[in-house]
């Protein structure tokens, strides 16, 4: 392997995030934290949101600081699971992603199981049943904000949404898809049985890619804004 390789990890937790450079000098791997920031939810009109635009701002700061450390060969993003953003047909974010601690999913398990047997859902996905799962968040939208789902062209989970902001590429990484309770664990694709039985829009789910897949490059706009090739 080539010596002096540097890569950037953007690691997001539910309360904080950080940018870390991983370096390989031909013999050993070393890590250096170059940026750390808080991840604070925002409550607006009784809904709890993620401040995703602020998080993206901190990604940009991390990229600028990484540039000062030398050439970065690649970057990757990881976040918590289940939460997502919806894009319209023009690729614009319809609203800030809602926080998994928001109360909108209360009672949604019962509505799902009225349409699809609980054992069937578990046999397909293998997921633990939690009200915060993407499945129940989508049911909450279908029940209470159907107009939002009607406007949606694409659903992107949090790491994929941030990747999209950087690259304009839309896809869903497999391991984060596994947190949704919508993934067919056997076939490693979206469960058409669950999606169809719950009358969810099929078109919003993007192609699934495996961990480590190169999905693209920084968009021209981001490259020019930050001065990064």
Label each PLM-derived region with a short phrase.
Residues 1-95, 123, 206, 223-229:
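N-terminal glycine/serine-rich phosphate-binding loop of ATP-dependent small-molecule kinases
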Residues 12-14, 121-229:
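Gly/Ser/Thr-rich active-site cleft segment
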Residues 27-28, 70, 116-119, 146-151:
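Short, glycine- and charge-enriched coil/turn segments that flank and shape catalytic ligand pockets
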Residues 98:
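Surface "functional belts" at beta-alpha junctions
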Residues 102:
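Carbohydrate-associated surface elements
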Residues 106-117:
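Hinge/lid segment of periplasmic solute-binding proteins
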